[in-house]
């Protein structure tokens, strides 16, 4: 009886530990694109980023807490820059500063994401 109870307790603890383990999934390009889509006008025309754009930059910052997340976001940003040919490099580089957000992911076509 006690042996069966001990096995049940160990099994329950193992399941709880698996469920409590944080996800290893890195941030997706869809998440990065959604966050920064409001910034396209600023990135292509310059000026001042909109409130929605800066909110997206803050959202991107909150998504990039781990090294894997930062690398994934960096690669997504490079892919997005390749898709949108009109993006001004200087505007992209200044975006986080203009929004008052210290990003751990540089927004640049030339960044080495490793």
UniProtKB/Swiss-Prot annotation:
<dbReference type="GO" id="GO:0006869">
    <property type="term" value="P:lipid transport"/>
</dbReference>
<keyword id="KW-0732">Signal</keyword>
<dbReference type="GO" id="GO:0008289">
    <property type="term" value="F:lipid binding"/>
</dbReference>
<feature type="disulfide bond">
    <location>
        <begin position="29"/>
        <end position="76"/>
    </location>
</feature>
<comment type="similarity">
    <text>Belongs to the plant LTP family.</text>
</comment>
<keyword id="KW-0446">Lipid-binding</keyword>
<keyword id="KW-0020">Allergen</keyword>
<dbReference type="InterPro" id="IPR000528">
    <property type="entry name" value="Plant_nsLTP"/>
</dbReference>
<comment type="function">
    <text>Plant non-specific lipid-transfer proteins transfer phospholipids as well as galactolipids across membranes. May play a role in wax or cutin deposition in the cell walls of expanding epidermal cells and certain secretory tissues.</text>
</comment>
<feature type="disulfide bond">
    <location>
        <begin position="54"/>
        <end position="99"/>
    </location>
</feature>
<keyword id="KW-1015">Disulfide bond</keyword>
<feature type="disulfide bond">
    <location>
        <begin position="74"/>
        <end position="113"/>
    </location>
</feature>
<feature type="disulfide bond">
    <location>
        <begin position="39"/>
        <end position="53"/>
    </location>
</feature>
<dbReference type="InterPro" id="IPR036312">
    <property type="entry name" value="Bifun_inhib/LTP/seed_sf"/>
</dbReference>
<dbReference type="InterPro" id="IPR016140">
    <property type="entry name" value="Bifunc_inhib/LTP/seed_store"/>
</dbReference>
<protein>
    <recommendedName>
        <fullName>Non-specific lipid-transfer protein 1</fullName>
    </recommendedName>
</protein>
<dbReference type="Pfam" id="PF00234">
    <property type="entry name" value="Tryp_alpha_amyl"/>
</dbReference>
<keyword id="KW-0813">Transport</keyword>
<feature type="signal peptide">
    <location>
        <begin position="1"/>
        <end position="25"/>
    </location>
</feature>
């Amino acid at each position: 009886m006690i042996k069966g109870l001990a096995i049940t307790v160990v099994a329950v603890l193992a399941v709880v530990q698996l469920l409590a383990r944080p996800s290893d999934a890195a941030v997706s390009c869809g998440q990065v694109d959604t966050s920064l889509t409001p910034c396209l006008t600023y990135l292509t025309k310059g000026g001042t980023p909109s409130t929605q754009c800066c909110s997206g930059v803050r959202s991107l910052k909150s998504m990039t807490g781990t090294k894997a997340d930062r690398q994934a976001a960096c690669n997504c940003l490079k892919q997005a820059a390749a898709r949108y040919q009109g993006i001004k490099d200087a505007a992209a580089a200044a975006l986080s500063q203009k929004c008052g957000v210290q990003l751990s992911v540089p927004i640049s076509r030339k960044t080495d994401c490793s």
